[in-house]
Amino acid sequence: MVKNNYPSRRQAKKQTNWFLIISSVLIAVLLVAAGLYSVFGVSRTVQQTNGSSVIKSSKQATDATRSKDTKGLPDVSPKDWELLLVNRDNESKELNPEIADVNGVSVDARIAKNVKEFLAAAQEIDPSYHLISGYRSVAYQTELYDSYVQQEMVADPSLTKSQAEKKVQTYSQPPGASEHQTGLAIDMSTVDSLNEADPDTVAKVKELAPKYGFVLRFPDGKTSSTGVGYEDWHFRYVGRGIAQYITAKGWTLEEFLDHLNDPV
């Protein structure tokens, strides 16, 4: 009898059953895997989409706020002479502006008329208002600054020169960092001492300053912006339109220039 190589019906049935079982298991595994991918894949996509939406919305909100904040920004350039910025972050060499005398104080000749009118207006509020300081050369600022440092060290012998300088810089700037060398800044008060004038009087003078192109340069609460504490006597010429805009916004010159350099 010739043997055939085909399995018997029982063997075939047995093999078929195992094949069906294995196939069913594989299909079930694939279906579960597909389901998990569908759930977590979609979730991840939604999270990524939502994350992008949040970032985009946040940026749009920031831009909208900034755009609103800079609405009506004057059409001027940071390079305009009225906006010259001199501070400890923007030191300058000797500028040698053309100067003019106003009541014994030197100022940039281009603002002499404004200084006279501003002083006269301040004197209508309080007749004791007078000019204390105006233009200073870098050489003179060096002498003044060094003398202040020496005074602090004499008053407190425990201070190092570095500590004395740090103390001095709360009321006077190092050579090259003083706004007085521009000729665009004036110190004007009813007294010859910093922050000792009547606050109500100072507030009135501060309010009328923009009419003559000036702003109170170092307002209270703005040290983080200017690097200088409150000074009730230091006014800076920036031009009438800009002075009115800055005052209305409650900005410092630094803040105005930041917006001017980086508009939306």
Give the location of each predicted region.
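Extracytoplasmic cell-surface/polysaccharide-interacting catalytic and binding patches
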Residues: 2-264
